[in-house]
């Protein structure tokens, strides 16, 4: 990587922030939390929660503490509903922020600290965790009040932190096999670092994206027929929007939750403005089965008798690719299985491909100067 970006490339080597010692520490800490908590509140916004949420909401283990999300809204209605969920539950909270000036996590952390102190008294500090950078005001709070402090890597931007304390602790609390996740990332790292350009899937994806961009396609839709990817889309959208969207350049990332949204945006994709190209995530291994049993009542769906919903879903997927590819470019990324290992592979693949895509486009993949514009006016209005 370029020397000027070196302070943002701590994610390139997965081992740097997810070696055996770090994983062991996180597993032991998560085990302690799981033994004492009904719910774990993840306070964070954007890169501080998207990676963890994408895996937790897809793979959370039955019986694991509920993961409740805070610090991602300023809506009093949403915040009150979140606080209502805490009633009667044994709680731990983790405030995750690289920049503790961000309003959403900062304000949520205050009301949740106050709740913890009211609920647990002098024992509250044992249940409060903060994940921040060394020397930050968040670390100062931990030192002063006895909260547990975890390091947010200074050399990793928020949207690249899946394989660090930021993403791994909440996942481990939810019962995710973080070793399998990290191994998936390591295996993908080895693959995309060692393969030649003509065989390198990350390089091919980055090049194709830029080729379509140059041909006038300004929107990329990441689509799948698996609802478990719902929050992974949010992570992916932030990754590409913040990394590429600058200097009046960039491909606008959106998601297609199929088959449901074939009945809404499907019309635009098929017949609307030709501005979209599509990338499909296709899970190749069947994890579950549900057979449509015959029914003596005539409902005109007898053609489904004996068919597995896996087969039906795949038929819808293949038909969609066939139809859409007649109008727009369609790529497919095959995902071996919906499990922690393959989520790890996806994280590293997209991070590395995004980095390459930004290099081709000629923008810095690791800054986000545009997000400061609204903050100036907001802080002025609030009297900061």
Q: Where does each model-flagged region fall?
A:
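Generic C-terminus detector
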Residues: 343-384
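Active-site phosphate/pyrophosphate-binding segments
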Residues: 119-278, 367-384
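Extended, charge-enriched "interface" segments that sit outside catalytic cores
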Residues: 1-31, 295-304
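A short, well-structured juxtamembrane/interface segment
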Residues: 17-34, 199-211
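Short helix-loop-beta junction
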Residues: 57-66, 115, 239-250, 323-327
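Flexible loop/turn segments at secondary-structure boundaries
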Residues: 48-51, 76-78, 101-103, 136-139, ...
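Glycine-rich phosphate-binding loops that contact phosphosugars or nucleotide phosphates
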Residues: 27-195
């Amino acid at each position: 990587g370029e020397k000027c970006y070196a302070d943002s490339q701590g994610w390139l080597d997965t081992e740097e922030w997810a070696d055996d010692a770090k994983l062991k520490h996180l597993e032991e800490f998560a085990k302690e939390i799981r033994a004492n908590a009904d719910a774990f509140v993840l306070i964070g916004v954007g890169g501080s929660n998207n990676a963890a949420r994408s895996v937790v909401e897809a793979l959370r283990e039955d019986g694991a503490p509920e993961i409740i999300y805070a610090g991602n809204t300023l809506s009093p209605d949403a915040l009150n509903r979140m606080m209502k969920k805490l009633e009667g539950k044994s709680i731990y909270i983790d405030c995750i922020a690289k920049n503790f000036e961000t309003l959403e996590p900062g304000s949520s952390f205050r009301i949740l600290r106050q709740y913890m102190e009211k609920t647990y008294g002098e024992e509250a500090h044992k249940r409060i965790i903060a994940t921040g950078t060394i020397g930050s005001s968040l670390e100062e709070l931990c030192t002063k009040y006895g909260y547990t402090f975890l390091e947010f890597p200074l050399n990793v931007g928020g949207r690249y932190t899946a394989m660090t304390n930021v993403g791994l602790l909440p996942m481990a609390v939810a019962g995710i096999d973080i070793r399998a996740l990290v191994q998936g990332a390591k295996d993908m790292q080895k693959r995309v670092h060692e393969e030649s350009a003509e065989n390198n899937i990350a390089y091919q994806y980055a090049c194709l994206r830029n080729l379509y961009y140059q041909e006038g396609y300004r929107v990329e839709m990441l689509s799948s027929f698996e609802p478990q990817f719902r929050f992974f889309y949010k992570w992916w959208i932030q990754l590409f929007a913040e990394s590429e969207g600058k200097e009046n350049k960039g491909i606008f990332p959106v998601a297609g939750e199929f088959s449901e949204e074939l009945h809404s945006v499907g019309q635009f994709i098929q017949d609307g403005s030709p501005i979209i190209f599509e990338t499909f995530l296709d899970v190749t291994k069947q994890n579950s089965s549900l057979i449509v049993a015959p029914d003596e009542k005539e409902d005109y769906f007898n053609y489904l008798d004996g068919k597995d919903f896996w087969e039906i879903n795949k038929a819808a997927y293949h038909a969609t690719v066939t139809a859409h590819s007649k109008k727009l470019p369609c790529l497919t990324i095959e995902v071996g299985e919906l499990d922690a290992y393959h989520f790890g592979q996806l994280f590293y693949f997209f991070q590395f491909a995004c980095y390459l895509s930004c290099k081709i486009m000629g923008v810095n993949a690791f800054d986000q100067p545009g997000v400061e514009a609204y903050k100036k006016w907001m802080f002025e209005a609030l009297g900061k």
